[in-house]
Amino acid sequence: MNKLNVEVLKKQFPLVEQLINLDEVCWFNPNVTSLEEGLPHVGLNAEDIHVASARLKRFAPYLMKAFPETKAASGLIESPVVDIPKMKAALETQYNVPIFGRLMLKLDSHLPISGSIKARGGIYEVLVHAEKLAIATGLLSESDDYSKLLSGEFRQFFQQYSIAVGSTGNLGMSIGMMSAKLGFSVSVHMSADAREWKKNKLRSHGVNVVEYEQDYGVAVEQGRKQAESDPNCFFIDDENSQTLFLGYSVAGERLKQQFDDLGIVVDERHPLFVYLPCGVGGGPGGVAFGLKVAFGDHVHCIFAEPTHSPCMLLGVHTGLHDEIAVQDIGIDNLTAADGLAVGRPSGFVGRAMERLIDGYYTVTDERMYQLLGELSEREGINLEPSALAGMMGAVHVSGSLHYQTRLQLTDERLKNATHLVWATGGGMVPEAEMSADLAKSGR
């Protein structure tokens, strides 16, 4: 995109100027619609989520044995929801905004196997591929006890095949560790933003890590090229994969069950607001889709991005989706939130979900570090920087009278609200790395 076009874009969409200036912005989409109207544009439905959920249950006996840490949840890869009242009080004081209702944290940061939200989609897509191959050759049928996949026969079978993926870190961790456990040969193409400890962990599991000096887009492209040259290589496409998307979407029905168990009501009088950090969009898009199907129009999903990588906000706001990258408007895509360092959004997710996502906001690296330290000090929970992007969501919603009026949020409905921050990663960060992050937070 040339300079003239950027000038035209700025005139057409004044918010773009603020993005270029790396300002923290918040935009509530006026074109958001009901689930009934928005769902047909997704191209997927509740039945697709049920199929994904059933598949994960089939794999549960295998996962329990392959990864004993999944035993507590009977082989399901799931995380707890916790209240964070001290953090809520700290946010109210710091930003001088009363946050009505309850502030909670969804600890995908502590998901078993790979310690991030990517354990949902990444592991699911590997399992789908493994099941497909094994059923096609008659080694497996859906009625079998899937723990048989641990046998030498299956490992030998999967060794004929390889898997490739491009990643800033967490998706590569999930896909790499799951693929290697099954017996696949796996290559993870990692962008310049990827943390060293993530590369080392993958290598320790026998994963081939290919490093790039460029950003996420280049890593994905190279992974795709590798797969094209080898008929036995399966490429997992973070930008366009409906399978990944469905792996994330199962989180909706699971959260509904958790809320039922906790006695948390979500209905017209008790709205739910969910704040999701966003990179390329697959993880938050899939989770938001699942939440919408589970809770209908009573859940409001809001995406959070770094000021240096606001790709989804830029794509949806301008309507250009994956036809524009942040670099096209002079933004460098360099952020400490490595999992969110994406310059070009998923066109599939942007177009599928734009009518169902209430809003988007950006947050600086400095603020993410500050929130990281605050959460650690107040609640004793340690996350990686990108996982804190969602923490400002309740402040934005509570401070926007315009948005509250549009949603007809009365004082009573606000008081009954649940605000859920989706913590996307950090549970497996090595101690030295976490200490360095905490030092940057000033704590």
UniProtKB/Swiss-Prot annotation:
Q: Which reaction does it catalyse?
A: D-serine = pyruvate + NH4(+)
Q: Please list the cofactors this protein needs.
A: pyridoxal 5'-phosphate
**Modified positions (N6-(pyridoxal phosphate)lysine) in chain numbering:** K118
Quote the InterPro entries the UniProt record gives. Answer: D_Ser_am_lyase (IPR011780), Ser/Thr_Dehydratase (IPR050147), Ser/Thr_deHydtase_PyrdxlP-BS (IPR000634), TrpB-like_PALP (IPR001926), TrpB-like_PALP_sf (IPR036052)
Pfam family membership, one: PALP
The EC code for this enzyme is: 4.3.1.18
GO function term, MF aspect, one: pyridoxal phosphate binding
Biological process (GO) annotations? D-serine catabolic process; isoleucine biosynthetic process
**Coiled-coil zones:** none
* Protein's UniProt keywords contain Lyase: yes
Report keywords, A-Z. Lyase, Pyridoxal phosphate
Transport in keyword set = no
NCBIfam families, per the entry: D_Ser_am_lyase (TIGR02035), PRK02991.1 (NF002823)
Q: Which family does it belong to?
A: Belongs to the serine/threonine dehydratase family. DsdA subfamily.
Q: What is this protein called?
A: Probable D-serine dehydratase
Originating species: Vibrio parahaemolyticus serotype O3:K6 (strain RIMD 2210633)
Source organism lineage?
A: Bacteria, Pseudomonadati, Pseudomonadota, Gammaproteobacteria, Vibrionales
